[in-house]
Design a protein with these regions (language model features):
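Secretory targeting and sorting signals
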Residues: 1-28
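Extracellular parallel beta-helix/beta-solenoid repeat domains
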Residues: 31, 35-377
Length: 377
């Protein structure tokens, strides 16, 4: 059923125009379809759980809040949320991370089931799509343009899929991009696949998260490609069980626009980095192409933030780097931020159970380090 405030003839016209190739999931048939006629927010306010909000092509100058379960927002990329002047393009969930106790805590799950399919989101000052306290979500097929801090940004959520998105930062309308294209923080059971990210400080971050997969993405033209990391002052003080596979991590040599003296961790990211494992456990980096990153290809190292947060166990344990092609990395390391000489593979020797196998590479630091830590199978 289609519910709208306009005449039935207009509904037929909207159904015929502008939506080729954009269809809600089959499960959406269980609810109504609401066609946006004024603002996206008005349609969401009128929706009930199970409904699909269909967004016609056009420019929507607004920020959207979703606090209901089982909603779908669907449209072509010609449907544009221009969030200039707002922190977020779309926010799902109203909770916040509590800092009232001895440690930070995620909010309870508030929204069960959310899908964003298609659309373009641009110019949000903080993030294109911010999710918090969401149990089950999919962010798919969206174009994120010139959102200077984050594109998709799910935190304290679980059972998520982020796929087939195009995330590009650095537009002149809002200045340089200052953080991460796709950020996953304090999440559980998340897959990030078939996305392209360019012109951010970091392409994809998996931080303080468990049971995650990052696969078949294109990370090109960022300062760094992929970070799997543990940062201080988060609800979850560790990252565990992450697979990073079959990604193209190419020429991420964008100069970091954040000063290393800014006091922000992002300012310490060296220009020209492929994949980083910073103090995370059970991370498998396999079958990636990591080429032409000026400072380094892949690095496994001890967490630098242990002294800041006593809950963090700093060593990277039981990690594997295997079957990757790493070439022409480390040839022009960042003269200010680089913490090691340039190389295709860097390992600081800390932790337990880390290993390397079947990689194609030319340089490593320290020399001969990977032969000292072979994988047993």
């Amino acid at each position: 059923m289609i519910r709208t405030l306009v005449a039935a003839g207009t509904v037929v016209a909207l159904a015929m125009l502008g939506f080729a190739g954009v269809a809600p999931p089959a499960a959406a048939l269980a609810g109504d379809t609401i066609v946006v006629t004024t603002t996206i927010q008005a349609a969401i306010d009128a929706a009930q759980p199970g409904d699909t909000v269909l967004v016609p092509p056009g420019i929507y100058r607004e920020s959207v809040l979703v606090s209901k379960s089982h909603l779908r927002i669907v449209g072509s990329r010609a449907a544009v949320i221009d969030a200039e002047g707002f922190r977020t393009g779309i926010r799902v969930g109203t909770g916040r991370i509590s800092r009232d106790g001895p440690s930070p805590a995620c909010p309870p799950f508030e929204v069960e089931g959310f899908t964003l399919s298609g659309l373009t989101i641009k110019h949000a000052s903080f993030s294109g799509a911010f999710l918090i306290g969401v149990d089950g979500y999919r962010l798919t097929g969206t174009r994120y343009v010139d959102n200077p801090v984050y594109g998709p940004f799910p935190v304290c959520s679980r059972k998520g899929l982020i796929d087939f998105n195009q995330v590009a930062g650095g537009g002149s309308a809002v200045g340089p991009s200052l953080d991460t294209g796709i950020y996953v923080g304090d999440d559980d059971q998340v897959t990030v696949r078939h996305n392209s990210v360019t012109n951010y400080v970091i392409g994809v971050v998996v931080e303080n998260t468990i049971h995650a997969t990052v696969q078949n993405n294109l990370l090109q033209g960022n300062t760094a490609g992929i970070y799997v990391a543990v940062l201080p002052d988060h609800p979850r003080p560790f990252t565990d069980d992450v697979v990073v596979e079959r990604n193209q991590v190419l020429r991420n040599n964008l100069p970091n626009p954040v000063s290393p003296d800014s006091g922000d961790e992002i300012g310490g990211v060296p220009t020209g980095v492929g994949i980083v494992n910073l103090g995370s456990d059970h991370v498998v980096v396999r079958h990636n192409r990591i080429l032409g990153n000026d400072s380094l290809g892949v690095i496994v190292l001890q967490n630098l933030f242990g002294p800041i947060d006593a809950r963090i166990e700093p060593d990277p344990d039981f990690n594997q780097v295997r079957g990757n092609v790493l070439l022409q990395n480390g040839q022009h390391p960042d003269p200010v931020r680089a913490i090691t000489p340039g190389a295709d593979i860097v390992y600081d020797g800390t932790g337990t159970g880390n290993c390397f196998a079947d990689n194609v590479f030319a340089t490593e630091f320290p020399a001969g380090i990977t032969a000292l830590f072979p994988c047993g199978d």
